């Protein structure tokens, strides 16, 4: 019996290739897995279990759709499990599940509705986390500030645990209300670590990827976040998105350096099972690896060799711009010389310092 994001797509081929696997779950398993345990030895009843995919004794494929936990607030918090691992230096925390956005490359792009936990229940969980001496909490919400009023309430809750706990969260720079901006600017240094999922600085790329929010608003929000002296903001770009050219990636890195982003993270697109972009890969001209993590190999806009250059650029950024000791110098060189990234990358690859 298997489950997880690997099985969010069509599971028939996997089950036929792996006959030792009896069934797989698609979706959220907290409620349906216990249900399956009541009938695991009665396969004739498996059709009643939402999200279960399996082959019947006569090898007919059965697909029970996707499982969703609608009573999200009613789930037992994972921290209360006897099996919860408290030995890690951080704890992951969901305050919401699902996403308002429709990004075609994300497994949460179709997860509606967004389900939330009450502020009081989150406070109780954080008190337990704090009692175990955990110093870092990674908030798993896809878009922390999709609801500005709720985001403000959460920030005030997080403030109750300062300076003992630092919170890492993903924020959408296009959705920053003036009220939320003021709230962020007043927070103490060290409370937050922000990830700004900008993905690309090109309107056609974002539109093709079905990412909501105006690019102009996102850029204004990103400038604001990067200028805050009381927190660090990392900006993300994704190579391999439809309509995204290599020269535009270099230009976008330079723009983000001009914003003084705390880190610039450049990743290659992965076409994950169950995503709209994977279903439309042929239509969009995307070729990708059939093996996990399903990395994009080529698009109409970017060749195999250019994607390799993007991966090398990512390593350059990690080794220099994203390294505190080198960041100021690297930023200055990027901004003062339009060709610096190209020439420095060529030198590093020729010297076999980056492969």
Where do the language-model regions lie?
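Radical SAM [4Fe-4S] cluster-binding motif and immediate context
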Residues: 73-231
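Glycine-rich beta-alpha loop elements in corrinoid/cobalamin-binding modules
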Residues: 1-66
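Short, solvent-exposed loop/turn segments at secondary-structure junctions
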Residues: 6-8, 30-32, 68-71, 100, ...
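Structural preference for long, well-ordered alpha-helical segments in enzyme cores
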Residues: 33-36, 154, 252
């Amino acid at each position: 019996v298997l489950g997880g994001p690997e099985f969010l797509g069509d599971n028939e081929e996997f089950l036929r290739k792996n006959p030792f696997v009896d069934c797989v779950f698609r979706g959220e398993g907290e409620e349906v897995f216990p249900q399956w345990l009541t009938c695991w030895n009665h396969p004739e009843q498996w059709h009643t279990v939402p999200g279960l995919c399996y082959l019947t004794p006569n090898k007919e494929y059965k697909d029970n759709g996707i499982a969703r936990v609608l009573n999200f607030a009613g789930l037992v918090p994972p921290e209360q499990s006897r099996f919860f691992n408290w030995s890690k230096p951080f704890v992951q925390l969901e305050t919401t599940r699902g996403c308002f956005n429709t990004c075609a490359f994300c497994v949460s792009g179709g997860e509606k509705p967004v389900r939330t936990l009450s502020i009081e229940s989150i406070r109780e969980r954080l008190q337990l986390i704090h009692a175990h001496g955990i110093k870092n909490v990674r908030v798993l919400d896809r878009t922390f500030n999709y609801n500005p009023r709720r985001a403000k309430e959460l920030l005030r809750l997080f403030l109750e645990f300062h300076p003992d706990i630092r919170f890492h969260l993903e924020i959408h720079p296009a959705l920053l209300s003036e009220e939320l901006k003021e709230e962020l600017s007043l927070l103490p240094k060290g409370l937050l670590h922000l990830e700004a999922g900008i993905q690309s600085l090109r309107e056609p790329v974002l539109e093709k990827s079905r990412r909501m929010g105006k690019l102009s608003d996102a850029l204004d929000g990103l400038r604001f976040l990067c200028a805050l002296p009381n927190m660090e903001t990392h900006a993300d770009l994704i190579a391999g998105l439809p309509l995204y050219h290599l020269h535009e990636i270099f230009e976008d890195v330079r723009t983000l350096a001009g914003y003084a982003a705390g880190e610039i993270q450049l990743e290659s697109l992965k076409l994950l099972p169950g995503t709209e972009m994977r279903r439309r890969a042929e239509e969009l001209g995307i070729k990708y690896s059939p093996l996990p993590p399903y990395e994009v190999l080529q698009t109409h806009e970017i060749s195999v060799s250019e994607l390799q250059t993007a991966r090398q650029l990512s390593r350059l950024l990690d080794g220099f711009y994203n390294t505190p000791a080198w960041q100021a110098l690297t930023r200055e060189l990027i901004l003062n010389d339009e060709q610096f990234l190209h020439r420095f990358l060529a030198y590093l690859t020729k010297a076999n310092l980056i492969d």
